[in-house]
Amino acid sequence: MKSVPLITGGLSFLLSACSGGGGSFDVDDVSNPSSSKPRYQDDTSSSRTKSNLEKLSIPSLGGGMKLVAQNLSGNKEPSFLNENGYISYFSSPSTIEDDVKNVKTENKIHTNPIGLEPNRALQDPNLQKYVYSGLYYIENWKDFSKLATEKKAYSGHYGYAFYYGNKTATDLPVSGVATYKGTWDFITATKYGQNYSLFSNARGQAYFRRSATRGDIDLENNSKNGDIGLISEFSADFGTKKLTGQLSYTKRKTDIQQYEKEKLYDIDAHIYSNRFRGKVTPTKSTSDEHPFTSEGTLEGGFYGPNAEELGGKFLARDKRVFGVFSAKETPETEKEKLSKETLIDGKLITFSTKTADATTSTTASTTADVKTDEKNFTTKDISSFGEADYLLIDNYPVPLFPEGDTDDFVTSKHHDIGNKTYKVEACCKNLSYVKFGMYYEDKEKKNTNQTGQYHQFLLGLRTPSSQIPVTGNVKYLGSWFGYIGDDKTSYSTTGNKQQDKNAPAEFDVNFDNKTLTGKLKRADSQNTVFNIEATFKNGSNAFEGKATANVVIDPKNTQATSKVNFTTTVNGAFYGPHATELGGYFTYNGNNPTATNSESSSTVPSPPNSPNARAAVVFGAKRQVEKTNK
């Protein structure tokens, strides 16, 4: 039997067979549908629609906004803050620092920047460990470059208000209340001639000529008098999925002024997996003392492996205030130790299809090959936002489908990120709580520093363990993306825009016995490529087992390719309410005792005929119900 990889419907894996191979394979098992078998359809009772989010509400590891300055020439129009000015991601924490320091050099400013450097290694160890927020700017900045041509002249501060997290939460409480306390910062719009009494440290500059900042308020700085600076406080009820809180400032105690902690905003948000979205509401709708008088849009998330911290941002509706905040669990919450479980998955498999020369046997080459294998076909955890609507590539949140009115079962799109163009393929439209797929640098886009690597991903919001069924046999049907090869030839499958042309994944789950069996098949012949057997413990939302391959890749190869036979560890989980979906992944890295086929398991021994076998697979499936005959 001769066939070709599944590269139809406009999608391309760009994995070609190696020398001597055509990319096809034979298997012993052939599955022929029978008309007497039950007919199934997706159980859509728990399906969700992708959230339609504005730019400010799109989840990311962090974000920020530039301070603004007042035009001192021409009509002296106000400088507002707006959503178009929001920076939704930073490629690294040093992005802000580098920009501010470059402007400092260009303007020949000799004073050091003000605020915390956006570099985790330099932070106070008493502050947050996983997410932090603040200001970073230079004073005495001027820009008169457009004075003659556009009658625009600016003078003030140059820099950013920002927050940045380095690890999104994976384990969260399923019930109970956690409290958090931390800090917040703000920047304001400007209006010529406008002053506010709260900004008493600014000598008439804040809001009049430039963005006001925390330094313009006479804040308490002595902890003996109470809380100091700007205070953020939160209460997260993980049972009701509600986040409430408040943002306050402190008045410094002096001979003529008493210490006072005054609330400026209330926070009300809904928790979505490890993110939250909602609003800030001012305590005053009008004020001559300050501009904190307008309701605003708020978005943020939980950070740290166990949601130990949170961070986020907000923008006032009147475009006069942008704020960032971060906080960590209070000592009371730490002592209470709420019961937590893994609810968020983010997995990334990285591999290259380059193979070594099978005839080379020198010690030097063998050593080099082993080192390459240690890094190839490996799986790692990545930050994920739970709802599986966005994939982080180089810290940029790439939207996954469905986007708009599309009937495509699998999507394939280009995304320009930094100096690279990535091809991102995602599956599947009928999956609401788990998404899988792959991405790679497009060879046709002249990317710089092209790695030649491929990346498979799996993202999902797991089923709480209390919602896993305890009885019943359930059928799950879905699809898979995968690569299998040896040192002579290879085969790959991704997806197709048409659902019935995708490589099928079929699973039977026995919730009584806590077992799962499955088959990953070819799209054209329905022949089985991988058999899966797994188990899961009572009260667990994850399964683990083995994936077995017993295939001949390109049997007509003139180099007499032998049958590839290996077994490796498969990991997966149930996703969505009441285990409505499932997904998983596995890799195989050959008969190499120093390599690891998954992040938590050692290499499974291979038969002598498969020392050069390699595989990488991700899959997902939807719970089925029998069709009603009419």
Curated annotation (Swiss-Prot):
GO cellular component, one term: cell surface
Keywords, sorted A to Z: Cell outer membrane, Lipoprotein, Membrane, Palmitate, Signal, Virulence
Topology of the protein relative to the lipid bilayer: Lipid-anchor
Ubl conjugation as UniProt keyword: no
Role: Haemophilus acquires iron by extracting it from serum transferrin (TF) in its human host. Acts as a transferrin receptor and is required for transferrin utilization.
Residues covalently joined to lipid (N-palmitoyl cysteine): 18
Protein name per Swiss-Prot or TrEMBL: Transferrin-binding protein B
